[in-house]
A protein has these predicted regions:
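Juxtamembrane and boundary regions of transmembrane helices in multi-pass small-molecule transporters
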Residues: 7, 135-141, 157-160, 177-225, ...
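Interfacial loop-to-helix junctions that mark the boundaries of transmembrane helices
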Residues: 3-10, 52-63, 176-186, 226-230, ...
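Hydrophobic alpha-helical transmembrane segments
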Residues: 12-16, 33-38, 65, 99-107, ...
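Transmembrane alpha-helix interface/packing and boundary motifs in multi-pass membrane proteins
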Residues: 20-30, 108-117, 148-160, 247-250, ...
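Re-entrant/interfacial helical elements at transmembrane boundaries that shape
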Residues: 120-131, 144-145, 158-172, 306-311, ...
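Membrane-embedded alpha-helical segments and adjacent helix-loop junctions characteristic
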Residues: 52-141, 283-358
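Structural signature of hydrophobic alpha-helical transmembrane segments
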Residues: 6-16, 60-72, 114-122, 186-188, ...
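Flexible hinge motifs at transmembrane-helix junctions and intramembrane kinks/re-entrant loops
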Residues: 19-38, 228, 232, 240-260, ...
Length: 436
């Protein structure tokens, strides 16, 4: 009857808006935040969702708040010269040897990406990497590629690292410690695999030079620290914030509140100008998330997501194991070619739906498969994840071109290796020894 027709038109219209938004994001002609906000506007104007529904049900403000809070907090830490000091320290430790420097800077990036947004990590570390590599007369491209790979792997290990994890943690009952215990071990394993891999692909082509004792002596770490009191206070508050994440489910306070409190306390304690800090927040990303949540909300309301969930189950069968590995590899391959943030935003309600249909409310391994796939898939191509795009843009500005082909040649095999190790990990941990 009439109702059916109506269902069909809005059903297809929500898909149309979604694909339009996606095409805009992938064309890179229009900033992705604007694509998402225009898509969100269409969803509301076309009557698929009301503004109230969009604001109340679809935008995950915990994700937005957590990212904003961490951006503010890291903005304060940045003012102390902490990150420049870390960069100089890594030159000293590596004695200026290109291969050791690549590994140390890569590990620092991976470590930073695990407790702050990976984008922020590479924004801080990329410019320093380029200047350090110039100092030791070697092309920064291998080191930058190492940093991209390790930022995506490091970010997958905790709930506050990569955006897919932030979103999954926010949309489910999973908390900080769940991520540390489940995606953490495989991240560590893959960091090791990545370093061996980098050794294989770049070991030969990096020169064997090193700095003289005299040159190393000239590197003064204390000279780059602009303010010791800001350094002490802001790093202490950062540590307390991370502690807050670890106990957030015990104290019953959501992670966004903890991050925003940390940010505000850091601004107050270090008496820095809030205008300056707020100006440096990556608003583009935050608005991208807001718009995206509404566009995906359109797909949810019109029943597209549940239709996809049913199609997925009938294609793969209701076997939890087969579904889990399908989620892992689908997420991995898809996230290599499309941004892993919109992909995850679409997959979250899809997995919720599948779990309901199959009565698998506690099948957390499906979330781990999504998280691992989306994070590691980001390593497949230069457009696979936000950090990649940012590193490439910053490098191009300095005259170093990381081409799509070069990156894919070096990194796609690494992505496949990490997905293989993850397949074995998920199988052994949740199906062989676990009780699915």
């Amino acid at each position: 009857g009439d109702g059916m027709m109506e269902f069909n038109s809005s059903f297809y219209f929500s898909i149309f808006i979604f694909l339009l938004t996606y095409a805009g994001i992938m064309s890179e002609r229009i900033p992705r935040s604007l694509c998402a906000l225009l898509g969100a506007g269409l969803v509301v104007y076309s009557g698929l969702v009301t503004q109230e529904m969009a604001l109340r049900h679809f935008i995950d403000f915990n994700t937005i708040g957590l990212l904003a809070g961490m951006m503010i907090l890291i903005g304060v830490v940045k003012k102390s010269g902490f990150f420049e000091a870390m960069a100089l320290w890594s030159v000293r430790i590596s004695k200026g040897r290109p291969k050791e420097l690549l590994i140390i800077l890569g590990l620092i990036t991976g470590f930073c990406a695990s407790f702050m947004d990976a984008v922020t990590a590479v924004l801080l570390i990329t410019p320093m990497t380029i200047s350090l590599c110039r100092r030791i007369h070697v092309t920064p491209i291998p080191t930058l590629i190492a940093e991209i790979l390790l930022s995506n792997i490091g970010g997958s290990g905790t709930m506050v690292g990569d955006p897919p994890n932030v979103m999954i943690g926010s949309a489910t009952h999973l908390v900080f410690n769940d991520f540390a215990m489940n995606t953490g071990p495989i991240a560590l394993l893959n960091v090791a695999a990545c370093i061996i891999y980098l050794e294989i692909i770049y070991g030969k082509e990096l020169p064997k030079t090193e700095m003289t004792e005299e040159e190393l002596g000239k590197i003064s770490i204390s000279s780059v620290i602009t303010d010791y009191s800001i350094l002490k206070k802001s790093v202490t508050i950062l540590a307390l914030t991370i502690l807050g994440f670890i106990v957030h489910n015990i104290i019953g306070i959501e992670s966004a509140t903890i991050a925003l409190t940390g940010g505000v306390l850091a601004i107050l304690a270090c008496s820095v100008d809030p205008h300056e800090i707020f100006r440096d927040v990556d608003w583009d990303s935050l608005f991208f998330f807001i718009g995206l949540f509404i566009v995906v909300g359109g797909l949810e309301t019109t029943g597209v997501i549940s239709a996809l969930a049913q199609a997925g189950i009938s294609a793969v069968g209701g076997d939890p194991e087969a579904l889990t590995f399908t989620i892992l590899w689908l997420s991995g391959i898809a996230s290599a070619f499309i941004d892993n943030i919109p992909f995850t935003a679409t997959m979250i309600p899809l997995i919720h739906n599948m779990q309901e249909l199959l009565g698998l409310a506690h099948a957390d391994y499906m979330w781990w498969a999504l998280s691992i796939g989306a994070c590691y898939g980001g390593n497949g191509t230069i457009i696979g994840a936000s950090p990649n795009v940012i590193v490439a843009a910053l490098a191009a500005k300095e005259g170093y071109n990381i081409t799509f082909g070069h990156f894919m040649l070096k990194c796609f095999p690494m992505m496949l290796v990490t997905l293989l190790t993850s397949t074995i990990y998920l199988y052994v941990r949740y199906f062989l020894f676990g009780t699915p």
